[in-house]
């Protein structure tokens, strides 16, 4: 490959040769654009829209449109896209990932493809990692878009429904990945189409694309409601787990991030919980709580994986070091950590709707992304998202010096050397950014520097609010900044003149991350736009990466050299061993994400079917034919499942059939066994169907056609939502235990697909049964007024937005009847409580 690259150039270089002629055309139009009057810019936008309506393609107008944006940016915000930024814009428009180094002006680059793709009127989403960046980027670039006659909006966490609809109705919408994803899920939970906020997913430009599509890929978006299980057992399991002895009662697998009981531990569990066989299926609940308590106590680390703030457990993002407010670990792990730390144990939540970022972003017609570091994950982008990575050349050559790693025998020796290095460089006024892997490590280093009298600022999850401000000062003369991993990403570090003369920004990595990309991101904070700078990583054999994944050869070499604690080695062999350990972990993580996607694809196909049908119900008012089909299916399936054809059991089967249908749609004693005992199966079906249809026709006349159609819609939507929520839970439980199928020589993914498909068919049938049951049992004096129901079922975007709001209707329903809202509860325990 190396020789071929030398002859033909890398893939990126070959692709850039194709882009260059387009960029030449854009630059050639510069003079023409300069001659335009200010008022001409909006007219040009209208002209482009008209040309597109007449059949021209976006690519036909691209050179002129890009040249127009370039001049508009120059006139409004004083910035003119340089050649490399124009290249980046073309790459993004083509639906690719542009790798652009820190400080190359990604925010400005996005204006080019955003403008061109917004001309179709179908909307463009520009995605960033947090609210601060979304608002900042919108505010910076809004003058450009507005000068061109486009409307620009931003989605922030605290917006209400109307504000969201307005923002999504804009030509270009800025927002965070989580807000876009949650809005999609909420849109598929509404009862009236007027409540939906998003339009169709057209074109998305994802900033920090590696962070969102790879680092976040394993974290599903979940809208949840309060579960009903008690939390007491988490405390019991925690008490038991704290009595265990490491290695004797349980073992820890650091590679898999899990802990397991040994045989001795199992014996202790059986004695403690007073069960005969811990592994028995009926003890699954105990196993589940013990596994989570083990993980909470012996795998999850405080101030690394999570932190405590105001008596609440907050997850710490392993890639950014940010506290993830509002996020909770699923499957009871969060509750287990709460029990471990002695804070209030919240109830386990029930999933109402969920999707992964992988599947959300794959729904866009066109997807593109920008980041400073994507090449190491090129295979994953191509395989999962169909995106290729093009490395965009920098405007100025990179002047940063990347030094070789220095390796120490112990962590203590390493940190002593880091402090010495900081003190030395501080004396000459060189600014430093020191990257740590956890809050705990950053605070330890901070206290060591305090003892040495070195003033510094600390940036980690605990000081999240000041993030952008702290990072913006990191390039000043003599400034020392300690930051967990990638905190402050998206904010430029600009050097002062004195800092530049002192050698530029020095990056010190206190540990190698398991991903080369994260290390490259840290390095990339220095040397922006040709600035001077330097970087070096300090590594010890006690670091997690070296301990868990490093080879024994390195340990052997260090032992032979007989290194003292504070002596270091710089060796190419050690550096390449570190890199191969990282590649091993990256490959392992990619495989995990790929397997998770195979599982998620099963429920994703089911989600698409449910949401598509749900959308059709929202759009079309008249469900008469669908409801009639459901009534027929329920009646026919009941006959088929109750009558076996065995003559001796015929009378009993008929009685069971009548009882079953009386629970769903037949009034008591309307059909007697003797009336149908002499009929064939087909005749029984016809007779029962005729009786049921007559009852429903009478109900329709009694309530009125318009009102019954409205009730059908609301009840069907509620039943679909309730059954879908239960199905998500069932699929999750299936997935938890499916890995064990490998012991039976079964492919777990295939088993999940097959059984998941059967469960889905069963859910579809249960939707029909419950819809028919509620429609036959509901008696309404007054039809639900659209506005009233819309108000009562609207999605709120405050902290309680995940709670399911029951529909209130003026019904004549018995207190012990099933509630017609579709919750599956009795009326007295559901909407009846509100009456």
Curated annotation (Swiss-Prot):
One of its GO terms (molecular function) is protein-exporting ATPase activity. Transmembrane segments: none annotated. Its cofactor is Zn(2+). It catalyses: ATP + H2O + cellular proteinSide 1 = ADP + phosphate + cellular proteinSide 2. Its EC number is 7.4.2.8. InterPro entries: Helicase_ATP-bd, Helicase_C-like, P-loop_NTPase, SEC_C_motif, SecA, SecA_CS, SecA_DEAD, SecA_motor_DEAD. It comes from the Bacteria. It is a peripheral membrane protein. Gene3D superfamilies: Helical scaffold and wing domains of SecA, P-loop containing nucleotide triphosphate hydrolases, SecA, preprotein cross-linking domain. It is found in: Cell membrane; Cytoplasm. May bind 1 zinc ion per subunit. GO terms for cellular component: cell envelope Sec protein transport complex; cytosol; plasma membrane. ATP binds at residues 85, 103-107, 492. Zn(2+) binds at residues 819, 821, 830-831. GO terms for biological process: intracellular protein transmembrane transport; protein import; protein targeting; protein transport by the Sec complex. Keywords: ATP-binding, Cell membrane, Cytoplasm, Membrane, Metal-binding, Nucleotide-binding, Protein transport, Translocase, Translocation, Transport, Zinc. Part of the Sec protein translocase complex. Interacts with the SecYEG preprotein conducting channel. Has a central role in coupling the hydrolysis of ATP to the transfer of proteins into and across the cell membrane, serving as an ATP-driven molecular motor driving the stepwise translocation of polypeptide chains across the membrane. Monomer and homodimer. Part of the essential Sec protein translocation apparatus which comprises SecA, SecYEG and auxiliary proteins SecDF. Other proteins may also be involved. PANTHER family: CHLOROPLAST PROTEIN-TRANSPORTING ATPASE, SECA INNER MEMBRANE COMPONENT OF SEC PROTEIN SECRETION SYSTEM. This is Protein translocase subunit SecA.
